[in-house]
Amino acid sequence: MTTTDATRLTGLDAALAETTDALFALQRPDGSWEGRLSASPGATADVLIAMHLADPVGCRDLIERGLAFLLRTQGADGGWGDDVDTEATLNGTALSVAALALIAPDAAAEQISRGWARVEQFGGAEAVRDVERCSLAVLVHFYLVLAGLMSNEGLLRVPIELALLPAPLRRKLTFAMPTAMAWGLMCAELLPAGRARAAINRAATPPAIAYLEGLVGFEGPDGGFVESPMMSANVCIGLTLAGLRPDIVRHCLKYFRATIKPEGAWAVTRDLEVDATNFITAGMQHVGLGADPRVAKAVRWIRAAQRDEDFIWTGAPPGGWGWGLPSGWPNSGNTGDAVIAIAGDGHDVRDEQVRRGAQWLLDQQNYDGSWSCFAQVGRLATMDPSFAMVGKARSPKVLYGPCAVMSAEAVSALGLSGMCPPGDPRLTAAYRWFAKVQHPDGGIDNKWYLGRTAGTGSVLRALADVGLAGSPVARRCISWLRLTQNSDGGWGDALGPGRSTVEETAMAMLGLCAAGVDPAEAMPSRGAGWLVEHRGPDHLWRPSLLGVYFLELLYRHDHTANGYALQALARYRELVRRGGTTSGAFARPPWTATPDPGKTV
């Protein structure tokens, strides 16, 4: 080891000690981490409208707090973004204006006027009606009609006949489906209908209600629809205006009270506690703290969060993990990360929970070798049903389709758990899909984060985890990351050229370290330096607005930043110690075969 390496390790050791201490201080008594999502003006406006329509008296205290949040977070340009102190968006601005105009038209008259002026700058009513410019056009237009700011000309009907679709198509709407069912019931009740339409409405109403009832049963008394205040608000509004199921409406109102944030606002979804605990636990294991009782408690919590029932709403089998409790939907990303964390605790597929989680991933693999988030996509179920809700197909913007990050998490889990040895045909199919979607310059898109860095770094890490660090796809990923490193040493294309973020820098570094790049090279050394230097006074990192929730709504998640950055620095330290090899107990578990690093598919 050179003097330079020793100096570098000393600095990394100190940084990791400070960061792990800070994270342990945030660990909850049950072993998990909260995973705080940013407050969303758009989600807050949606919830306010729901409470105002359903129970304005009983929810008066919550409504007042939410209105105060919107009033103090309006931007200097009159708009609202998807988060506070971020660039205004048409979705965030129009939703906030609608809530203020509906609930406090006199008290907030000046703010409404400024907000509507910002909507006009986005293109006004014409832009609101255009699903290409306003991704939440169905919601936004309707709320502005309720508030008296737009006419109902061009108002889109949400067709209740979605409840009659064959299950493979209905499942592809994934977490849009609860909104579709409730708003379909509302449209059936409120909008004019001829004889044929009335017959369709009568036929579709019972299965639509049964769908919502079933989800309430899955959620239990404390859950929300899709574990989301925003989706729960949509269900509450639809059923309230349809005059149906006041019991489900009360269920939603109870959920709003349970999920309000200290600042008086709501996030697009409940906090991502499973994500947070998975990410941080894996980071602690990479640091070398896997035997620490606090990490062992986190692993036990992850085990307890595994779902034991079929999830009929997406067709998923038992054995998966969702993003939060009690009712996050099982999905490929959380399941892959949970399997990785349990495997990092020293367990392979001989462990029943690891085996079930890995089998869940295999059962959910798409026909083309990829993975989507929630639902498996088969050869015959390729139609995009979202056109029925917005008047045209929006395949690039819906989230049921394959995702590089989700696929990468699944591949890593299957390899590190020992479920799929090198050369397994399921991994070969995944590799071929990565090769298919990789751009000629080596970058790879994904659906759940902005930009290409997240997809490219995640795929590189996954390929290295299954012994394909020397494959053509991996080499092109490395080349792309080399060419796109920013001048400050970080990575990031999500927020614009040259704007490095913690999440993207960490994901790039994870891929490079897993692939075994030379730690003495400037590229990984500068990336690690950027991460160390960009911690806050609390030794943790600040998240960026690059997570994609649904139809272009964005969010920030504190422990996506902290967990991935911790993993990246720990894996870089291991790379330095081993002189550029990645053969560690965690990076290459003893139960997996050691493949030829130069092998290609």
Residue ranges of model-derived segments:
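Preference for long, amphipathic alpha-helical scaffolds in soluble/luminal domains
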Residues: 1-601
